[in-house]
A protein has these predicted regions:
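Acidic, metal-coordinating helix/loop segments flanking the phosphotransfer/catalytic sites
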Residues: 16-18, 22, 31-59, 123
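Conserved acidic carboxylate
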Residues: 8
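Alpha4 helix (beta4-alpha4-beta5 surface) of REC/receiver domains from two-component response regulators
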Residues: 15-19, 72-73, 96-113, 117, ...
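His-Asp phosphorelay/catalytic-motif detector in bacterial-type signaling
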Residues: 1, 26-27, 55-59, 83-88
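Conserved alpha-helical interface elements of two-component signaling phosphotransfer modules
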Residues: 11-15, 82
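Active-site residues of response regulator receiver
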Residues: 63, 93
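The feature encodes the CheY-like receiver
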Residues: 67, 85, 97
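Short amphipathic alpha-helix used as the core "switch/output" element in two-component signaling
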Residues: 48, 72-85
Length: 140
């Protein structure tokens, strides 16, 4: 089963995220998806993912600036569906815009993290978030 779903279109940020998770033994089963439409298909077991069992990821790390369907819409659909509402979603984005933060929380995001520009701090932020959501947090 997928533990972490990483929805990120930037290959460098995705690699840094996975490296930070791996170095903290949190990356046993990470699935990386590069656009919002594919992320929704994955979560809701549609299209190319229709054969997936309905085992939901334990954590979704979601960028906001995504091709095809943006992160806000992905968040809206996940949090408005009874089957997926309880999945912890952490926005991990370069956007520190107030409207993105407010809208994300209005839609039910569990955490909103702005990507640090410094590589070392980026890795630290991801590792701490992964540690909290995968090991410390108790989800239903």
């Amino acid at each position: 089963s997928v533990e972490i779903l990483l929805v990120e279109d930037n290959p460098t940020d995705a690699e840094l995220t996975m490296r930070a998770l791996r170095s903290n033994n949190l990356a046993n089963n990470v699935t990386w998806i590069k656009n919002g439409a594919e992320a929704l298909d994955f979560v809701f077991c549609r299209g190319a993912y229709s054969s997936r069992k309905n085992d939901h990821p334990k954590l979704i790390l979601l960028d906001l600036k995504l091709p095809k369907v943006n992160g806000i819409e992905v968040l809206r659909q996940i949090k408005s569906d009874e089957r997926t509402r309880a999945i912890p979603v952490v926005v991990l984005t370069s956007s520190a815009e107030e409207r993105d933060i407010v809208e994300s929380y209005r839609l039910g995001v569990n955490s909103y993290l702005v990507k640090p520009v410094d590589f070392e701090h980026f890795g630290e932020t991801v590792a701490k978030a992964g540690f909290y959501w995968m090991l410390m947090n108790k989800a239903p």
